């Protein structure tokens, strides 16, 4: 496999696959690839570059869009996550669908996904922003 074939293979990778490749190369060779990530994103198609920017986001807000038929269950999970009192959690859940229905903001992606999963298991409709 020559260099051109390697480049062609890399061009076909998704943004997630590129991130995985970078991590593997960093571990294998003990280097940091901060600059090459930007180069790889610039070489990607416009849609891929937009996905890269979305994936580079480090802080997320968890927005409550709805509570379904299990309002009490959702309130309990909101209280557990936020530490709010019963009335405050109830008020937050009742704001579902409005821009003010932020359960938690400025948190890392993995924590935001965990919170989203817990809320969805309780019957809530949730989005990450």
Curated annotation (Swiss-Prot):
Keyword Transmembrane helix listed: no
InterPro entries: Ribosomal_bL12, Ribosomal_bL12_C, Ribosomal_bL12_C/ClpS-like, Ribosomal_bL12_oligo, Ribosomal_bL12_oligo_N_sf
Example GO biological process: translation
Keywords: Ribonucleoprotein, Ribosomal protein
Source organism superkingdom: Bacteria
Gene Ontology terms, MF aspect: mRNA binding; structural constituent of ribosome
Keyword match Ribonucleoprotein: yes
GO CC term (a single one): cytosolic large ribosomal subunit
UniProt-listed HAMAP family: Ribosomal_bL12
Function field: Forms part of the ribosomal stalk which helps the ribosome interact with GTP-bound translation factors. Is thus essential for accurate translation.
UniProt subunit comment: Homodimer. Part of the ribosomal stalk of the 50S ribosomal subunit. Forms a multimeric L10(L12)X complex, where L10 forms an elongated spine to which 2 to 4 L12 dimers bind in a sequential fashion. Binds GTP-bound translation factors.
Family: Belongs to the bacterial ribosomal protein bL12 family.
Protein name: Large ribosomal subunit protein bL12
Source organism of the structure: Pseudothermotoga lettingae (strain ATCC BAA-301 / DSM 14385 / NBRC 107922 / TMO)
Classification of source organism: Bacteria, Thermotogati, Thermotogota, Thermotogae, Thermotogales
GN (gene name): rplL
